[in-house]
Amino acid sequence: MFGVTLAELSASLGDPVLALGLAAFALLLLAIPISFWMVSGGSNSAVVTLLVALANLVLTAQLVLRWWQSGHFPISNLYESLCFLAWACTLAQLLVERSLSSPIVSAAATPMALLCVAFASFALPETLQEASPLVPALRSSWLVMHVSVIMCSYAALLVGSFLSMAVLFTDRQQTLELRSSSIGTGGFRQAKLATSSMDQSDGLRLSSINLSRTEQLDSLSYRTITVGFLLLTLGLISGAVWANEAWGSWWSWDPKETWALICWMVYAAYLHTRFSRGWSGRRPALVAVAGIVVIVVCYIGVNLLGIGLHSYGWFFEA
């Protein structure tokens, strides 16, 4: 699926839009090993932030150039939407890192943008990478409103969900027993600290640091997912209004509409467990991880089917 010939790579370098996509891929690919090295004890967080910021600027230039070439907002095919999603993921990562400067954030978030750019650059056929005229139904201001908001919601939900996944791994490094939480912010918790061969004061100090980091990740993932959920809600509402204007129906149970609703319900369940049940830590994190699978099915899986109004085409046969 990811096999790219030398001739195809040369052709990509000849197209400035595709070349910018490859440049963003190279920057993100370079950032990943550095971010994981930081997690293991390195101290080059500024380097990763710089690489991700450069990748975001390159993707911005790519989208603006495609917009200028095509004459419409660049989210009309799978290549453009993947690049837009990568742009939104890098932007979300940079915003999250302003709240919590931790190597875990970059190690969890950077691979998502890399996968989006890699899939767009190396897996899609040329027919889905080229700009094409919009069909009449898509020549609407609702295109920018609906699709861009949905893509941004996916980015926020994915970043938040991968931060929740990081909570699962950081929890494993300590014996943390959660009792309750104040609306997902970790307001009250009890921790059972593990004993070790070191003296008690050192053990308490290390466990307190780990607990604080886990709480921060848990709270930050909750807030990021909340933003993504609100954007997803807005995207679904705008999509329904647009559908009614274009086709005379608010909801048609199109495959992507159905899976978008499932996605909304999964993250609604996540927020319910945080807000109403007082869950925090591992249990809501598992719900968020399930949301990642639903987003992948909703965004990529529907295109594998090649059916419905939202499908960009069955790209394995394109």
Curated annotation (Swiss-Prot):
Membrane found in the keyword field: yes
Cellular component terms per the entry's GO annotation: plasma membrane-derived thylakoid membrane
Coiled coil: none
Gene Ontology biological process: cytochrome complex assembly
Origin superkingdom: Bacteria
Subcellular location: Cellular thylakoid membrane
Main location as per UniProt: membrane
Family the UniProt entry places it in: Belongs to the CcmF/CycK/Ccl1/NrfE/CcsA family.
UniProt function note: Required during biogenesis of c-type cytochromes (cytochrome c6 and cytochrome f) at the step of heme attachment.
Name used for this protein in its record: Cytochrome c biogenesis protein CcsA
UniProt source species: Prochlorococcus marinus (strain MIT 9313)
